[in-house]
């Protein structure tokens, strides 16, 4: 069973602030997940060939083709913030 302290550490590593209710919920949910993984570890997989894909692989991507798109002004009509004909978005990287 996972401890509340371990959930707090995981939340800290993910930069998450959890309420007491969320901490309780995640402690229970992570405990359930770890219990399920433990059950999976009990499966006899002798003779089962390891594989990364369960279905045959084939290239499902299409060739890149240049096509028409909507005019810039029309795209910017939907933008909550714009400047000099460009989308304006919040900075996510510090200077």
Swiss-Prot record:
It comes from the Bacteria. GO terms for molecular function: asparaginyl-tRNA synthase (glutamine-hydrolyzing) activity; ATP binding; glutaminyl-tRNA synthase (glutamine-hydrolyzing) activity. It holds the Pfam family GatC. InterPro entries: Asp/Glu-ADT_sf_sub_c, GatC. It is an enzyme of class 6 (ligase). It catalyses: L-glutamyl-tRNA(Gln) + L-glutamine + ATP + H2O = L-glutaminyl-tRNA(Gln) + L-glutamate + ADP + phosphate + H(+); L-aspartyl-tRNA(Asn) + L-glutamine + ATP + H2O = L-asparaginyl-tRNA(Asn) + L-glutamate + ADP + phosphate + 2 H(+). One of its GO terms (biological process) is glutaminyl-tRNAGln biosynthesis via transamidation. Its EC number is 6.3.5.-. Transmembrane segments: none annotated. Keywords: ATP-binding, Ligase, Nucleotide-binding, Protein biosynthesis. Allows the formation of correctly charged Asn-tRNA(Asn) or Gln-tRNA(Gln) through the transamidation of misacylated Asp-tRNA(Asn) or Glu-tRNA(Gln) in organisms which lack either or both of asparaginyl-tRNA or glutaminyl-tRNA synthetases. The reaction takes place in the presence of glutamine and ATP through an activated phospho-Asp-tRNA(Asn) or phospho-Glu-tRNA(Gln). Heterotrimer of A, B and C subunits. PANTHER family: GLUTAMYL-TRNA(GLN) AMIDOTRANSFERASE SUBUNIT C, MITOCHONDRIAL. Belongs to the GatC family. This is Aspartyl/glutamyl-tRNA(Asn/Gln) amidotransferase subunit C. The gene is gatC.
